[in-house]
Amino acid sequence: LYMLDSDVKVSNSKYTSVNPIVFGIKKSKAKELGFTNKTVKTKDIVNAISNGKLKFSMSNPTSTNSGASAYLGFLYTLAGNPEVLKKENLQNEKLVKSLTTLFTGLERSSGSEDFLEELFLNGNYEAVVTYESSIININKQLQQQGKETLYAIYPVDGVSISDSPFAYIDNKNERAKEIFLDLQSYILSNEG
């Protein structure tokens, strides 16, 4: 379903969740890098990678939402957060160099967020770029296994956000719309 199709009417769209894309770094590594006692910018992460002090894993930007969102977030912050990314931004040598440097730190990529979590939990990786909710899930599992947990880094110069809208596809059925609105109201409530 594509919301811009002219014959499909979507209404009552509301976000049911908002999930930032963050760096999860093993706490000891984050502390070693000085990331636990200061505000961290994306360039700080790039510098750590450039100095050979940080490697990370993430989902593939060409096949996953979190990977694509992370990539676009990196582009925007390393380009200086322009209102709109333009061709001249993308051709800027400093941006290309920073982005290239950032991705020299990519140790492993995966084709899905679930597989990325599994890879991280079963491997010996020091950092992962993924949804905040995935970092929380990974940390729960690491705690259960008695392993070191991750420290979430939210770069102050920009974080990509993944949102989840819940909308009604209008088929002119008032009873169905009523049921939808009740369900949506419940999902957005404290009990939901």
Where does each model-flagged region fall?
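Ligand-binding pocket segment of bilobal, Venus flytrap-like solute-binding proteins
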Residues: Y76, N81-Y154
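Extracytoplasmic/secreted proteins, especially bacterial periplasmic and envelope-associated proteins
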Residues: M3, V40, D44, N65-S69, ...
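N-terminal segment of the mature folded domain
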Residues: L1-S63
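Short helix-loop capping/hinge motifs at secondary-structure junctions, enriched
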Residues: S28-N37, Y76-L85, K172-F180
